[in-house]
Amino acid sequence: MRRRLFVVHCGQQEYDRTSGGDFMQGFQKVVGHQEIITHLQNAISMNKVSHAYLFGGESGSGKKMMASLFAMTLQCEKHGVEPCMECASCKKAQNKNHPDIIYVTHEKPNTISIDEIREQLINDVMIKPYSSPYKIYVIDEAQKLTLQAQNALLKTIEEPPAYAVILLLADNPDALLPTILSRCVQLNLKPVGDQLVKDYLMNEMHVPDYQAEVDASLAQGNIGKAERIARSPEYEETLEQALRIVKYVDSMPLHEIMETIKKLTAEKDNIDDYFDIFSLWFRDVLLFKATKEVDALVFKQELNGIRARANKSSYEGLEKIIESIQKARARLNANVNFDLTMELMFLTMKEN
């Protein structure tokens, strides 16, 4: 095994569906990310598996599924580039009880401590595999490793036993030390194309065509988010409420805007979903104003409302509204006052 830096940027899904049924087709079950899959399979077939890999990408992009399939394939008794799903090793891996695939856990929600890394990995890695060619450690949420934990882990990554493979999964790889990054094969899972997401929702989850198109647009290339949207009755309520707001905000008196903000205070955990819907709606309005094309709209069934807003608002006004949504999202991420942030955004929508 060789340690080297190899960065793959793939313009194609974490959907963390790592139960047995989701593995039944191996890598074929993964939506997109073909370049990354090919790289992993080539490493296996050429016997050039590295000691450390870093799977980067936002939550829901597919990191956990990709890493789990890679680990399962490495341990498969058929020694192919896909897990066979039938051997004892694959069955144990599917059931998450494989003795040589270790998932590192942590007690505190926001940190992985040096003691947890020492106990579950550093001390354990010196014990040879129980029944497999590799001993594989999966560290999910690796961005939560403390500085001390990272420094301790670095020594193992630099001088690992020949059989050790460490798979780090991180929403934000930049939170890791440059010295760790430089010693890992970095595989960055980027958003999947909307058509791939739509096809997945229709074929695998039996979502109707129009709804699949809307869900795919709202998911923004994230299969995990697309699944959540398609399965969640609560999201339907969010969608209806958000569309009601954008359709009528221009005629709302100030007291009704303030009442809307009060209701949204209870939805703070889902506020990013509202911002996504607001942005897509006004993008549709701007697109329709410029082209009169209906087929390119996300919310085709809302054509009357989109046409009415397009006739009322100027190009400059629509651009101001879209910018105000982006600013509101950034302000809330920076912990600016919720009510004030939402009021400024809604007033921009109303006045433009």
Show where each model-derived region lies:
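Clamp-loader machinery-focused feature within the broader ASCE/P-loop NTPase space
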Residues: 2-148
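Conserved catalytic/switch belt of AAA+ P-loop NTPases
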Residues: 151-168
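A short beta-strand-to-loop transition that corresponds to the Sensor-1 phosphate-sensing loop
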Residues: 141, 168-173
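Charged, glycine-rich active-site and insertion segments that engage polyanionic ligands
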Residues: 16-18, 24-72, 89-92, 162-164, ...
